[in-house]
Amino acid sequence: MKLLVFGISYKTAPISLRERVIFSPENINIALNNLLKKSDILGGVILSTCNRTEVYLSIKNFYKAKKIIILWLYKFFNDLKIKEIKNNFYSYIDNYAVSHLMRVTSGLDSMILGEHQILSQVKSAFFRSLKNKNISIDLQKLFESAFSVAKKIRSETKIGSYSISIPYIICVLLKKIFISFTEIKVMLIGSGTINELIAKQLFKYKIKDLFISNRTIDHAKNLAIKVNGCVVEFNEIFKNLNKMQVIITSTYSRKLIITYKIIKSIIEKNKNKKIIFIDISIPRNIDKKIKKITGVHLYTLEDLKDLITNNLEKRKNAATLAENIIKKESIKFMSHIKGYYSSEIIKKYRFQINKLKKIYEKKALLELKLGNNPENIIKKLTYKLTNRLVHKPTKLLYNTSCSKNNKDLYDLYNKLKIDL
């Protein structure tokens, strides 16, 4: 048996092609069952996400299996051409397949280096195949090993600790400034995707008070419900600024929302007031001149980028350590699986010999019951059993002798000979 990965990812194909090769929850089992009808395919797992579609298989022959998979994909996805499959799909066999799965589950092959969401996606794919009895023992061992390696990498390299998402970086920044999140009030201006992610991250950190403001009041209300926040009407923003410790803006406004003049006025009325402004809008929503005001600190995307770059470097260093772990673990797995196959073959061989022994033993016991001569029975038993056991080795020796290479013949003899 061999292990094979056949797939497509963001590295090898544009989204216009990837979106045509996505298995839905409704058709994924049907697709895999169709593939497993082929005698050369012994087991399989389909992983289908927005960034990759991969088929992990246990197979008999690489070249036959590859032809089967290409034809299977072509038939299953009506608008997919054979040429597109050959030009954009990759394949990995045995130890390369093992290393690839370990890299995928550990987030090393992800668009965002080290992201952990892929691990749960791979687990879902594995358990789906396990539930439907579509998985072979070698594939099961491979996936279980990959999950163990992913856990080891996260534990030993801390690759997941160095987040590079803006919401997380903002929280890291605020943690450096404030002792506790439970004592600060934050206002988010804008309720788009990025501010929603920031709001959810702040909610996880148990922020004391979270205020949401947006030009469309319903959008602000919807987000506030999700994070247990309060709504501030857009035209009421400036009345509430003096109550806040942190203001984060992310809107599509092409004009400045927070000006130097407004903030100067607020600070003059509230002596010793300190406010943190974080502007992640493009174009910027906050006048950069407010940095000149005592007690005011402004952070923009450029400032956050430095933190992101720093964390990305840490991730890359962690990834190097992770690659070393995978190299060792993939070798260990291949050694283990080869040992497993060997032991299974040996068990099978010994079972056959034992079965043969029982057949002749049964015949001999029957003859003894009939009162036949015991000495003749034993001679007959050993003669027949010996002939059966040495038939194939003798044939092998004869065929080797016909090759006119005496060294091969003597090497084989030395391997087959019985030590007395």
Swiss-Prot record:
Top-rank lineage group of the source organism: Bacteria
Key words, A-Z: NADP, Oxidoreductase, Porphyrin biosynthesis
Catalytic residues (positions): 50
Gene Ontology MF terms: glutamyl-tRNA reductase activity; NADP binding
Residues of the site described as Important for activity: 100
Keyword NADP among record annotations: yes
Intrachain S-S bonds: none
List of residues binding substrate: 49-52, 110, 115-117, 121
Enzymatic reactions: (S)-4-amino-5-oxopentanoate + tRNA(Glu) + NADP(+) = L-glutamyl-tRNA(Glu) + NADPH + H(+)
EC id: 1.2.1.70
Binding site for NADP(+): 190-195
Pathway: Porphyrin-containing compound metabolism; protoporphyrin-IX biosynthesis; 5-aminolevulinate from L-glutamyl-tRNA(Glu): step 1/2
Record flagged with keyword Oxidoreductase: yes
Function: Catalyzes the NADPH-dependent reduction of glutamyl-tRNA(Glu) to glutamate 1-semialdehyde (GSA).
Family affiliation: Belongs to the glutamyl-tRNA reductase family.
Domain remarks: Possesses an unusual extended V-shaped dimeric structure with each monomer consisting of three distinct domains arranged along a curved 'spinal' alpha-helix. The N-terminal catalytic domain specifically recognizes the glutamate moiety of the substrate. The second domain is the NADPH-binding domain, and the third C-terminal domain is responsible for dimerization.
Full protein name: Glutamyl-tRNA reductase
